[in-house]
């Protein structure tokens, strides 16, 4: 089982970001964490969660480092008995707000993986993306993370912007390699609804061409691709999603999954604080669960179990195998090109 914790607080809102987040609301942090503690108690009881069964925790956002580390202590005290002894605990952080003190305190609480929202090592691109840090701060943040005791560090990159060229992307790869990070998450710029970037096609470049180039160069730099957007030392939390593991979800905007249903927390900070037990449930039937497993397996090294496929789906998978699009090994079909994951999944699903 996994645990996702959503920290919606941000210092500023990036123009491409469609995630649930708020600015200027840090004064609500104490009440928010209290609500999450109450929510966790209810979820573990209602969903029959046993102690030491949570194998991974992920603090995402928003910006977890926008909130003082002291606010996390009561929550860690609450969740600790349910964590496996080798639990992977990741916290996202921004280079400008992840101070050495914050990193040390979070490391002492048990966080053992840090994920920096670097996005780029070019200051003009960072400005274009609305980021409030610069390349120098990225390098300092990684150095501080090492000093704080972290030996598992991720850096996020965004590509497919109007400023990107193969030459510049090659330099991005050189920077993450030289920093010695363990993992890279690389995301194509998407023009999401309800964001300032929405519909502005002039902000993008051909991400398919750039994606192929970036994937090749990241792998040449030693970051092996294991999922459509992730490279390097495998993140257990990411892998857990692709394996269709159950996951609890704390915080406003967060989504959880248990057995055959998905639940949605209140999509509003104040509403969540007022009633953290407000949940919208979505029951998934066997066909929907089957489709999800096909899509998730096609997007990652997890692969697709042959035994979950219907006879027509198995026939389609064999066709793709004969065309060299899939490999079959030990009862699973493995995708040879993650960029075609959705098309492959749709073909198999029929």
Ranges and model annotations:
Residues 337-350:
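Short, amphipathic alpha-helical interaction segments positioned at domain boundaries
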Residues 1-3:
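Extreme N-terminal starter segment of soluble prokaryotic enzymes
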Residues 310-322:
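Short amphipathic alpha-helical interaction segments
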Residues 332-336:
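Minor-groove-contacting beta-hairpin "wing" of winged helix-turn-helix DNA-binding domains
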């Amino acid at each position: 089982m996994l645990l996702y914790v959503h920290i919606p607080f941000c210092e500023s809102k990036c123009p491409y970001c469609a995630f649930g987040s708020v600015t200027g609301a840090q004064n609500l942090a104490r009440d928010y964490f209290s609500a999450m503690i109450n929510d966790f108690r209810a979820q573990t009881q209602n969903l029959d969660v046993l102690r030491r069964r949570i194998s991974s925790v992920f603090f995402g956002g928003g910006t977890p480092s926008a909130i003082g580390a002291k606010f996390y202590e009561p929550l860690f005290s609450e969740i600790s008995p349910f964590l496996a002894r080798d639990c992977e605990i990741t916290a996202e952080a921004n280079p400008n707000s992840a101070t050495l003190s914050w990193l040390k305190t979070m490391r002492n609480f048990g966080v053992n993986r840090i994920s920096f929202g670097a996005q780029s090592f070019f200051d003009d691109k960072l400005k274009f993306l609305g980021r409030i840090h610069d390349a120098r701060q990225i390098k300092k943040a990684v150095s501080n993370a090492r000093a704080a005791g972290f030996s598992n560090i991720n850096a996020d990159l965004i590509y497919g912007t109007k400023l990107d060229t193969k030459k510049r992307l090659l330099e991005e790869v050189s920077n993450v390699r030289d920093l010695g990070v363990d993992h890279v998450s690389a995301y194509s710029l998407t023009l999401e609804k309800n964001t300032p970037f929405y519909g502005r096609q002039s902000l993008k470049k051909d991400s398919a061409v750039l994606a192929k180039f970036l994937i090749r160069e990241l792998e040449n730099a030693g970051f092996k691709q294991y999922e459509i957007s992730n490279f390097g030392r495998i993140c257990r939390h990411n892998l857990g999603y692709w394996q269709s593991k159950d996951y609890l979800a704390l915080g406003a905007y967060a989504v959880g999954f248990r057995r055959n249903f998905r639940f949605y927390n209140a999509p509003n900070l104040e509403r969540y604080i007022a009633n953290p037990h407000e949940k919208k449930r979505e029951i998934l039937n066997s066909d929907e669960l089957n489709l999800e497993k096909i899509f998730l397996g096609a997007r990652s090294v997890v692969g697709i179990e042959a035994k979950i496929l219907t006879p027509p789906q198995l026939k389609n998978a064999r066709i793709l195998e004969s065309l060299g699009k899939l490999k079959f090994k030990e009862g699973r079909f493995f995708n040879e090109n993650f960029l075609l994951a959705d098309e492959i999944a749709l073909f198999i699903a029929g």
